[in-house]
Amino acid sequence: PTSQIVGTQATLNVLTGDEIGHVDCSPAPDQDEPLLALGAIHYHGQPVFLVIADSHLNARKAARLGRITYDEAPPILSIEEALAANSRFEEGPRIWSRGDVASALARAPRVIQGRLEMGGQEHFYLEGQAALAQPGEAGDMHVTSSTQHPTEIQHKVAHALHVPMHAVRVETRRMGGGFGGKESQGNALAIACALAARLTGRACKMRYDRDDDMVITGKRHDFRIDYKVGVDEAGRVLAIDFTHYTRAGWSADLTLPVADRAMLHADNAYWLPNVRIESHRLRTNMCSATAYRGFGGPQGMLGVERVMDHIAHALGLDPLAVRKANFYRKSTPPKTGAGTAKRFGGAHSPAAPANEGPQTTPYGQPVEDFILHELVARLEASSDYAARRKAVDAWNAANPVLKKGLALTPVKFGISFTLTHLNQAGALVHVYQDGSIHLNHGGTEMGQGLNQKVAQVAASVFGVGLEAVRITPTDTAKVPNTSATAASSGSDLNGMAVKAACETIRDRIALHLAEKHQTVPASVTFANGRVRVGGRDLSFAEAATAAYQGRVSLSSTGFYATPKLAWDRLKGHGRPFFYFAYGAAVAEVVIDTLTGENRILRTDILHDAGNSLNPALDIGQVEGGFVQGAGWLTTEELVWDAKGRLRTHAPSTYKIPACGDRPRVFNGALWTGENPEDTIHKSKAVGEPPFMHGISVLMALSDAVAACGDGSLYPDLQAPATAERILMAVRRQRGQA
């Protein structure tokens, strides 16, 4: 009874779903996720009541006094149980196709089929979910939130309080990590704090302890992918049929766009002339799966990479040769740095003439800038792939206990939100009369270096040093209607918006100085903290002062909307992405066939960041993304028991990669070349694409397991490839299962 809780010392109030009604905190349009349970409990860990007390400790003590009576019902937990119960989102599976798959499969010289299961992943941001709400005058509410999406927090809090959005101000200074886990999962805390602050008239703060955070909040979607592929004797794909099964949890959250993006990346880097992709989005009694770095892309990409490995094994070919044989053709010379294409092109290009035009993805987007032929050739050379392939084979022939594996996998990742209207950003820039610059933009900083890159953009426009630029916390009262800092879009969108605002102010200053010194604006230059005009040399501060005294506005907003996008998700056709980011990774591993334990010995990565805004930051993202991706596919295992209780909800039971899990030799480099599209300084997004380099580790582990047998049985290693799964796969290879 709530009366027992309210009667405790320092407890101010207790709220239940019956009292507050359906207060929605879901990012989905269906509004199917109430803040507090209403009559039914849909998963173990679902919030039921809210305790308001004078301290965090007292609130937790009081909450332990609560008693809840349940009538247990059998949960739907597995993909098989959801299919049997027809428990799903949408009326049925989503199906996209091209060509005549059935006929092409029937005519194919070889048909291969299989199944791949991959687990979910906990975000494990170092700073947990947290929010602070402070009531203001006239019903206003100021919310400070650890969120990737301040505008969604603003919208949800305003809806919960029954006030317009202008009455709610949301501010985010920075986050201690996000990875997609703070795109929508912070809604509940912000709403709860705002309701408590409105009720008590006092500021209210809330944060999850690590165990609560892991039990309550969403994870990466786990998938099962069934495939049937027809190939010729050279390993070229003639037709492929994918079926994706997505375990979504109890509410929609972001499942539909995540599953869509998995379908959009089912081709990865490969031309699939006849393809069918069927996607089932299944409702289960677990915490709702949500956004996570890659947003479905890694799952879809892993499916086709498993197919390439399976083809190579079935035909007795080198997996890299099969991958290269199925690459999209190079329709035009890639717009890379001087000499790069000449040095690494040619022999590795497909036989089709370059003037045939671009091939298209299964959803109809032309692949016009495909650089993986040259990029992979360069990585083959720099990583000494061919010699190491021979060395690994020789090692495996001589060592019965420790087996090595080697794999090279490519990445082609689409950049843009698939919900087209989210591809926009705003910025606000002030230049003060002393030459200092105040900048605010709609992106959020979570350790990825967005503010550093945006400050560089502003400094380059005005020709000043970074010390002149101050970025203030992301604030819905300064830049409205922001999109989430997600989909690797932070630098692309906000960088362009900031550039537009800064150029407006710079051009005003240039016009004023040109008129004053009787010259043309084009002759006014900004560089190295100086402004040159009509033979005069001014400091930027002097130029700003002159403009101020000339009554020139030194404040401007900037806005950017990504061009060229047109996407119809119902038909599965259009151009959902502005461009593709590319890369490739080589991983070498060793496994102990007696225990299943394994190590990553060496990793070589070559990644396409376009004309990098900050190579040091981008290399950090590439290396960190690889480690996180490798963790998803090796050590990070989520385990639920038969009643739907998450058993891996603490660092003691859930293992993210540690220092000892990193490759012993780690070589990361950036591809030299500009983005052919008109992005900020011709750069490319680098947040999500490197995550998929971790796929090379699973493929290398599979290669090592295959070395334990006679080649007749495909390893069929599932993910995450824990020591237990590796050991079982080894035993199957040796006929001991």
Regions found by a protein language model. Name each.
Residues 237, 251, 437, 597-598, ...:
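Hydrophobic "anchor" residues
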Residues 101-161, 260, 407-436, 441, ...:
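Conserved beta-alpha junction segments in alpha/beta enzyme cores
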Residues 24-29, 62-65, 154-156, 179-185, ...:
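Short acidic, glycine/serine/threonine-rich loops at helix termini
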Residues 38, 127-132, 224, 405, ...:
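Short glycine-rich loop/turn motifs
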